[in-house]
A protein has these predicted regions:
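Active-site-adjacent elements of ketosynthase-type condensing enzymes
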Residues: 131-139
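Residue-level signal for inorganic ion chemistry
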Residues: 9, 105, 187
């Protein structure tokens, strides 16, 4: 058994390495915890997308390249070797995007995935709450349907990138009578 990269994988490594050498900013971007830095990182997301590098494993129909796990690992190795900027949209790209691909409606996929891939929509996460921390079963913020809208009542904390994001996703208690690890709904909220 020969263990190593195939010729096409080696060629792929050269391709991403070359693109990164030409495009990674020579001066590090400001922190994305500031307005200026956030906008710089959003522009980087757009640049990645223009080179078709923003979502290497996503299906082509959602703005990706449709690559496999080995190619994704090659991409990640080269990305970090080049000291490329941190991904400001990692909450959307790595957490919400795959969830929508698996469980989202066609309408949700159409509305959110391409905008996520291009950097048009930056996402924050809304998991944690005071008194709940990382214990998702302890969530108390509620979401109840009233007409064609949901009324959300409660508080979230440590919402990564919420200060500058366009959208947030989070877990909310939609059935307070259920067992504590049930009755939760994932909601997408324009902020």
């Amino acid at each position: 058994m020969k263990i190593g990269f195939s010729d096409s994988q080696k060629k792929f490594r050269e391709e991403i390495r070359g693109w990164l050498e030409k495009n990674v900013p020579k001066i590090p971007l400001n922190s994305f915890d500031t307005q200026e830095g956030f906008e710089e990182h959003r522009e980087w997301e757009k640049k990645l997308n223009s080179g078709n590098w923003s979502m290497v494993t996503w299906p082509k129909q959602y703005g990706g390249r449709g690559l496999n796990l080995i190619e994704w690992l090659i991409f990640e190795e080269e990305y970090y070797r080049a000291k490329a900027p941190a991904r400001v949209n990692q909450n959307g790209v790595f957490l919400l995007g795959p969830t929508l691909m698996e469980y989202g409606s066609d309408k949700q996929k159409e509305k959110f995935l391409s905008a996520m891939a291009t950097g048009e929509h930056i996402w924050s996460q809304g998991w944690s709450e005071p008194g709940a921390g990382s214990d998702m079963a302890a969530i108390r913020t509620t979401a109840f349907k009233k007409g064609d809208k949901y009324i959300i009542n409660g508080q979230k904390t440590w919402s990564s990138r919420a200060a500058f994001a366009d959208w947030t996703f989070g877990l909310f208690r939609s059935n307070p009578e259920s067992e504590r690890h049930r009755g939760l709904s994932l909601s997408l909220i324009h902020i």
